[in-house]
Each structure stands twice: as structure tokens, then as C-alpha cells.
């Protein structure tokens, strides 16, 4: 009788015992009168030794990635044959029976991490690509993390509740994926961009702690690393302050990193306001793994004769600087030109510089800084071989963002970023609204259900551009990992927010009438957060793309080479749905 085991279960106690393993063939080595097979299952790899003549005939027919059953005796390898690179490298199975469960066609690419297959080929044969250890392990880590999340939240008395997948179309920024109704011709469901409204309804229903590993859908233009469908941890709590949510998430992530990566995170994450993040790092999702920071030099240049600075300050704008210590000799004219191109992309007045040589400014705009030279050198403790970059704009936010991007570029070029660090950061007190210069209207900075801070509520309509919300983001290594807020739980206040963004009563009733009605029935104060599972696992596994941590992702054009979706449907189906297809050239 053979004991059925997995590859990782080979151990000393099974020496000279009969074992049976079902696995895939990873490697074949022919040595004349015997053959070695390296086999692999989900758990580990193992070596099989084939010496018997009748089994050699079967083994001769076996090719890579055949699915086989091996029965044999487990034996200890000779000391000089032990493979230290395999966890089971001290053992091998002496084959007594071999069964080919299933053959494998010629492979479209080698099942190795360093194969040169195209992305489309890997996605088309995703089931083969998933056999690679590196990819498989990322998916397994994802499973472990979501399992820990569930267990952690259930122990905290959260209820895992499912919200609808077919919902009313209430666009939240991106376009909705819509689904035609066969029964109600001309009407459409939408796939949810997030469970936002439903989780708030759950709070109104009296379920004070909710979570869901939610599938979300956004019909966005093809762009970089976006996926049309993604997964987020969605949670909401009643009678809560943002500090309660911070603590909950910090404890949860501490558990995940300890169990999945054996990394001990700090019990509390750093916290900074949106304004500080922009002023100091030039980003609302700053990478804090390195110390290069922005400074505002506007006051020190108030009497500057340099026209760009003069005009900026005349328009009550902002001048930002970035000082790079003892690295001036690394910045050639070509490198500085590259940085100037970044500044242009962000529509600043330009990027300017000056190096410190012989305790004086040199190069760049040095000749325009003669008056302020010694004052600036003293104020900012500038030394020889330092370089100082300047950018200016009448808009504070534009100057910050441009210099923030230059900061990241310089850090990458100089190797300042520690790729092994995990730096979490809470950014809070975001603006409630953004002003659109083209349409001359206000739009929600995050979403329209976030509560303004108390001191701004009375004057909302007068100063929407200065209103701060109870909004917070969780950032990891310069990536926005999660976003949340304390929500509005008052119908009148919610309608005031709608009015500011141009959703007058009729429009808001049409789109959100069901939700506004619910706010009339004793809504509790509540708040929550949504954390991107795909992004979290991507960062934990140091992957370069979220495609690496999604089981069956789409490509960059939102199509699936695996099943050729999206695809056309038959005329009969279209007729049944009451849909006519209009082509672009019609």
C-alpha cells in the first residue's frame, strides 16, 4: 500500500516506505541506464530516480509538464548528491510504478522565471504561467493575506456582508460598466465601482461593523497598470472617529506582514496632513523611504530681481526648492535637462538650479542670486558640491507637484530609495473639493459622501475651495493603498454638497433619491476605508505590476487573450435585449 503524499511531505520517517505523488514534470535528465525526473506540485519539488527497465521505457515517452503519478520507495540521497537548493534535496523516490495521467503539448514558452515570452502569450496561457514558482507563490501569499484579513475582522465582531453586483448607475468619476436588462428593455444595471452607497445603507440598517472582499469595476481608458476589475477590502463602522479606523488598519497590517513576510511593522504609522505632504514631499501620496524634502523659499526671495520669481511672487505664487547635499558633481547638463522636461510636463515656470562652488553659487541662475547669495547659503546651510533646484508657479499646488516628481526622479537616479523598506503613512485633512478651470465647477476631491470638518460646515457655500474634509488616505512607499473618510449622515448636509458640485435637487433625487431617503431614518455617524488588495499584494511581493498578483488579469487594453473577451454577441441576443449596434462610421 502506497502512502499518498505531497512533494513537501518527504521526510526521514518515510525512508524506505512506499509513497505515491501526483505531480508535473519540471525537468528530465537522461543518464543512460537511469533517468532522473524533477517533479513539482503546488507545495514543493522532488526528485525521482528511474532504474527499472520497464519503467525506463515509459519514462522515455515522458516530456516536460506531463502530469504523472509516481509510486516508489523514498530513499536518502548520497551525501555528494544532496541538493541544498531544494527543501527536499536530501531525498529521492526510487520509482516502482509510473502512470502518465495526462500528456502536455509542445509548450508555448518555458515554465521558467527568465523566459522571454511576451505578456500576451503569458496571459493567453495563464494556466501554464501560473506553474512558475514566483507567480504561484504570489497568488498563494494573496490567499494567505485575505484569509488573515477575514479572521482578524471576524474576531473584531465585523460581519462579512455581500452587496449587490447589479446596481443603479451613479457614476463616481470613471465610467460605469453597464448591463442591459432583457426584461426592462432600454434600462441598464451597472457594475459597482465600489460598494460605497450600500455599505452606508448597511450602517443605517444597524449593522455597526461591516466588511467585504469586494470586486469593483471601472470602465477607464487603457492606461498603464489599470485593470477594469479589481479587488478591495471594503469596511465601514458606525459611531467611529478616524483614529479608530487608523488603529484597526494598523493592527491588521501588522498581523499580515508578520505572518506573510515575517516583517514587524511599527504598531503606529506616521501621520501628516495633506498640506504638509504637499509642502514637504510634493505629493499627496509621498514616498518617505528617503529624506529628500522640499522647502518654500518665497519669503527669502521677496526682493528677487529674477523675473520668473518676481512675477510669481507678484501673483502670490510659490517658489519651491530642493537641496541635494554633496552630489552636485553627479548632475551633468544632460541630467538637468531631463529634470527640466519633468517640470515642463507639470506646467511650472521652469526648473532652475545653482551649484555651490568655493562657497558661492555657480552655474544656472547664480548670476541672478548675487544679492541673496550669502543669506541663502547661511539659511540653508549650503556647502560646496551641494546643488539647489528651484521651481515657481502662481499655483502652490502646481509648484509642489512638479518639484515632487523631480524629487522622485533624483532619488531614483542617486539610488536613495531602500527597496527593502515598507514605509506606511496616513495622509489626512484633504480638501473636500477640486475646482475645474475648464468647466468652472467644483468636483469632489475624493467622493461626494465625505463629511466636511465641523468648522467649515456653516460656510460651505462661501468657501468651497478652502473646505477641508474628514478624509484620509493610507500610503505605502509612494503608492496610494487605501482611501477613506467619515461620511455625511445628514440629508440636508448631503444635499448642500450635491448643490455645490452641480447636482441640484432634481438631479440628486434622480441619481441618489433612494440614498437620500435612507438618511431620513436615523442614520448613525459612520466612516470607513477601502484598501486595494491587488496593490497591497503587489507591494508586499515587490512585483512591478498588479497583473502579477491577479489570477486571471486583463492586458493593458482591458482584453483577455485567454478567452478573447470582450467578444461580440449574436444578432439574436442583441434583438432580445433591444440593442442596435451603431458603428463609428455610421
UniProtKB/Swiss-Prot annotation:
This is Aspartate--tRNA(Asp/Asn) ligase. Its EC number is 6.1.1.23. The lineage of its organism: Bacteria, Pseudomonadati, Spirochaetota, Spirochaetia, Spirochaetales. GO terms for biological process: aspartyl-tRNA aminoacylation. L-aspartate binds at residues 172, 218, 446, 487. HAMAP family: Asp_tRNA_synth_type1. Coiled coil: none annotated. It catalyses: tRNA(Asx) + L-aspartate + ATP = L-aspartyl-tRNA(Asx) + AMP + diphosphate. Keywords: Aminoacyl-tRNA synthetase, ATP-binding, Cytoplasm, Ligase, Nucleotide-binding, Protein biosynthesis. GO terms for cellular component: cytoplasm. It comes from Borrelia garinii subsp. bavariensis (strain ATCC BAA-2496 / DSM 23469 / PBi). Residues 196-199 are annotated as: Aspartate. The record marks 31 as: Important for tRNA non-discrimination. NCBIfam families: aspS_bact, PRK00476.1. It is found in: Cytoplasm.
Amino acid at each position: 500500500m502506497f502512502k499518498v503524499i505531497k512533494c513537501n511531505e518527504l521526510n526521514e520517517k518515510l525512508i524506505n516506505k512506499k509513497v505515491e505523488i501526483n505531480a508535473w514534470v519540471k525537468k528530465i535528465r537522461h543518464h543512460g541506464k537511469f533517468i532522473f525526473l524533477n517533479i513539482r506540485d503546488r507545495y514543493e519539488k522532488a526528485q525521482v530516480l528511474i532504474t527499472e527497465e520497464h519503467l525506463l521505457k515509459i519514462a522515455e515517452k515522458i516530456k516536460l509538464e506531463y502530469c504523472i503519478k509516481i509510486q516508489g520507495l523514498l530513499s536518502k540521497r548520497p551525501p555528494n548528491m544532496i541538493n541544498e537548493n531544494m527543501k527536499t534535496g536530501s531525498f529521492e523516490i526510487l520509482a516502482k510504478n509510473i502512470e502518465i495521467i495526462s500528456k502536455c503539448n509542445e509548450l508555448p514558452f518555458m515554465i521558467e522565471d527568465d523566459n522571454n515570452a511576451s505578456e500576451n502569450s503569458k496571459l493567453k496561457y495563464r494556466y501554464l504561467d501560473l506553474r512558475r514558482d514566483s507567480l504561484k507563490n504570489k497568488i498563494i501569499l494573496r490567499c494567505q493575506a485575505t484569509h488573515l484579513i477575514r479572521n482578524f475582522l471576524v474576531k473584531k465582531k465585523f460581519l462579512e456582508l455581500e452587496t449587490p453586483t447589479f446596481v443603479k448607475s451613479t457614476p463616481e468619476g470613471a465610467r460605469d460598466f453597464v448591463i442591459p436588462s432583457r426584461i426592462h428593455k432600454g434600462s441598464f444595471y451597472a457594475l459597482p465601482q465600489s460598494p460605497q452607497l450600500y455599505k452606508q445603507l448597511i450602517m443605517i440598517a444597524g449593522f455597526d461593523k461591516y466588511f467585504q472582499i469586494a470586486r469593483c469595476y471601472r470602465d477607464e481608458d487603457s492606461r498603464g497598470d489599470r485593470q477594469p476589475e479589481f479587488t478591495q477590502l471594503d469596511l465601514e463602522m458606525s459611531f467611529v472617529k478616524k483614529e479608530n479606523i487608523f488603529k484597526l488598519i494598523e493592527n491588521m497590517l501588522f498581523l499580515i506582514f508578520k505572518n506573510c513576510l515575517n516583517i514587524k511593522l511599527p504598531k503606529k504609522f506616521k501621520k501628516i496632513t495633506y498640506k504638509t505632504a504637499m509642502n514637504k514631499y510634493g505629493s499627496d501620496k509621498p514616498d518617505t523611504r528617503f529624506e529628500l524634502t522640499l522647502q518654500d523659499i518665497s519669503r527669502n526671495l521677496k526682493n528677487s530681481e529674477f523675473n520668473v520669481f518676481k512675477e510669481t511672487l507678484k501673483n502670490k505664487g510659490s517658489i519651491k526648492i530642493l537641496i541635494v547635499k554633496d552630489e552636485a558633481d553627479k548632475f551633468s547638463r544632460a541630467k538637468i535637462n531631463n529634470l527640466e522636461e519633468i517640470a515642463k510636463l507639470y506646467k511650472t515656470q521652469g526648473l532652475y538650479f545653482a551649484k555651490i562652488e568655493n562657497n558661492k553659487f555657480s552655474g544656472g541662475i547664480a548670476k541672478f542670486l548675487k544679492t541673496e547669495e550669502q543669506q541663502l547659503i547661511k539659511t540653508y546651510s549650503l556647502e560646496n558640491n551641494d546643488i539647489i533646484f528651484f521651481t515657481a508657479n502662481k499655483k502652490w499646488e502646481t509648484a509642489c507637484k512638479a518639484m515632487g516628481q523631480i524629487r522622485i526622479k533624483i532619488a531614483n537616479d542617486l539610488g536613495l530609495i531602500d527597496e527593502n523598506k515598507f514605509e506606511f503613512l496616513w495622509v489626512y485633512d484633504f480638501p473636500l473639493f477640486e475646482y475645474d478651470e475648464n468647466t468652472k465647477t467644483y468636483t469632489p476631491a475624493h467622493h461626494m459622501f465625505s463629511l466636511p470638518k465641523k468648522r467649515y460646515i456653516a460656510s460651505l457655500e462661501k468657501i468651497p475651495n478652502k473646505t477641508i474634509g474628514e478624509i484620509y488616505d493610507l500610503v505605502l512607499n509612494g503608492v496610494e493603498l487605501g482611501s477613506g473618510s467619515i461620511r455625511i449622515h445628514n440629508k440636508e448636509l448631503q444635499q448642500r454638497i450635491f448643490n455645490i458640485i452641480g447636482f441640484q435637487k432634481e438631479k440628486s433625487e434622480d441619481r441618489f433619491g433612494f440614498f437620500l431617503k435612507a438618511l431620513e431614518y436615523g442614520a448613525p455617524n459612520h466612516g470607513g476605508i477601502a484598501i486595494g488588495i491587488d496593490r497591497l499584494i503587489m507591494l508586499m511581493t515587490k512585483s512591478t505590476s498588479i497583473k502579477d498578483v491577479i489570477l486571471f488579469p486583463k492586458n493593458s487594453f482591458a482584453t483577455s487573450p485567454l478567452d478573447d473577451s470582450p467578444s461580440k454577441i449574436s444578432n439574436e441576443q442583441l434583438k432580445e435585449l433591444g440593442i442596435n449596434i451603431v458603428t463609428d462610421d455610421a
